[in-house]
């Protein structure tokens, strides 16, 4: 788990005296880093007793064209990613990634690590 609270040190390096301990709601989690492979999901419990589906691996995408028609197709590879240029080489799927499909290039509109599904729109 990753703690997302304040640093224990000031910008000059001095230690800050602790007024209280850590809280569970201050914990974060590691990124899912969804890869292209056979579909693998993981259920995570969240605040309020809700569930979140982490998509760890996926090789299919729901692609919508300009006319609004949606079809399920396979993902070949990642050709662009504005989040991190190194994700292209590692074939990591994030929101905004440009992927190559048999229908053409598509841009991912969902958040695979939090939604549990990959949706995309076809680029012209």
Predicted segments, located by residue:
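Ribosome-associated RNA-binding proteins
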Residues: 1-124
């Amino acid at each position: 788990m990753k703690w997302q609270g304040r640093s224990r040190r000031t910008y000059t390096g001095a230690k800050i005296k602790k007024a209280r301990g850590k809280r569970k709601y201050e914990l974060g989690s590691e990124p899912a880093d969804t890869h292209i492979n056979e579909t693998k999901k993981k259920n995570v419990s969240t605040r309020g007793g809700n569930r979140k589906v982490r998509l760890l691996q996926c090789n299919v995408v729901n692609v919508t064209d300009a006319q609004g028609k949606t079809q399920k197709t396979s993902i070949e590879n990642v050709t662009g990613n504005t989040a991190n240029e190194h994700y292209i080489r590692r074939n990591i799927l994030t929101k905004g990634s440009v992927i190559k499909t048999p229908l053409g290039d598509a841009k991912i509109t969902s958040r695979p690590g939090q939604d549990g599904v990959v949706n995309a729109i076809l680029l012209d």
